[in-house]
Amino acid sequence: MTTTDDRPTETANVRLGLAPTDPRPANETGPLADRQKTNPLFNDQKMKLGLFGTNCSFGLIMSHAASSYEVTWEHTKAIAQRADQMGFEALIPVARWKGFGGSTNFNGNCFETYTWAAGLAEATEHIAIAATSHLPTMHPIVSAKQATTIDHISGGRFALNLVMGWVTPEMEMFGGSQREHDRRYAFGQEWIDYAFKLWSETGSFDVDGEFFYGRDVEAYPKPVQGPRPALVNAGNSASGIEFSARNVDVNFASLDTLENVKTYTSSLKEKAKSEYSRDIQTMTYGLIVCRDTEAEAKAAFQNVVDEGDWGAAGNVIKIAGSGASQSFDHVVKEYQERFIAGWGGYPIVGTPEQVTEELVKLNEAGMDGMIMGLIDYKEELEIFNDDILPLMKQAGIRH
């Protein structure tokens, strides 16, 4: 990628006059639709729903617990189409270039997320489809163009989940060295500023920043969604919160208690409003285990833990605990089993009534959505459809 280290010398910096001589037509230079109308992430459901991790091996569980889940195109497509039929708002993939070792090599078998999103955009009708992108691995010009293309394929349903690349062994595969935590967010801010211009500028422009350099930059067409595609970020550190409040539409948070959820969501939403005059949604993730009885649900959850890949979990905890990510600090110290059963997220275990009650509590604490993992996505979506969705409607958090 062309960064500021690759700036051409003054003698080589000659403009070749390739900019269009006539104004570009409206279908190239402007958004085609209001994203409030095309992207379900902006609908009026009180508690939005989504699936997390249906593109990579073992989903959200580091475990050999029995499941029909597999990483094949037909399987992931079937899951996406069923969630779409059920009225879920979003599919958010995990971006992974290297597994976490252990006996499962957790998440090591993984579909690349932009092409995954493009395929599912064509295969679905209503649900928002995200790509999760490690910003250090993608130039903004390439990523913005891919995002625009998927937005056109989907009719304005695309979302881009921006991640800074906290897994050091993974980032080192690309030949560079890992930046310090706050420097990753400084890079991310310049990256997204560049992308914003690519999605909005109707003519060519120059970029001359700390991390990126470009001359006569242009990008056509623009996304379907105006003013830009939906953006997601999962940063929960001070730098991550600042980045989210300033730039994105959904903050994706890993939290441990309802009290912390309430404090976190109110603080972030107030920061976005008071400092940047923006509205932001907060959503969480975690493993949902629902069975007919509480005992059955707890037994299924415990089986995930008992069959856990503690080697992979230990590797994740080691990387997160090294300071590579500050978003998991509280989880690393106190809730190691949550990595085995839910990737460090908020677990909900119980009967349909208990699951619904917990979702209501999360919503009352300020969460606008739950992006869930399931032990067996394809099979357990039917439990959610038949037993939980009706109760959520009765509770007033879905309609």
Task: Indicate residue ranges for each PLM-predicted region.
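Alpha-helix-loop-beta-strand connector modules within alpha/beta enzyme cores
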Residues: 104-130, 187-191, 274, 384-399
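Hydrophobic or amphipathic alpha-helical targeting/insertion segments
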Residues: 141-143, 148-166
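Active-site mouth loops of central-metabolism enzymes
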Residues: 59-74, 132-141, 177, 225-238, ...
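Glycine-rich, proline-tolerant flexible connector loops at the mouths of alpha/beta enzymes
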Residues: 90-114, 255-258, 372-385
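Conserved, mostly hydrophobic/aromatic
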Residues: 49, 83, 87, 120, ...
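Catalytic domains of carbohydrate-active enzymes, especially glycoside hydrolases
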Residues: 71-96, 243-251, 361-367
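An alpha-helical appendage that flanks or caps ligand/catalytic pockets
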Residues: 10-55, 81-85, 174, 181-227, ...
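Hydrophobic faces of well-ordered beta-strands that scaffold small-molecule active sites
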Residues: 47-51, 91-93, 129-133, 158-162, ...
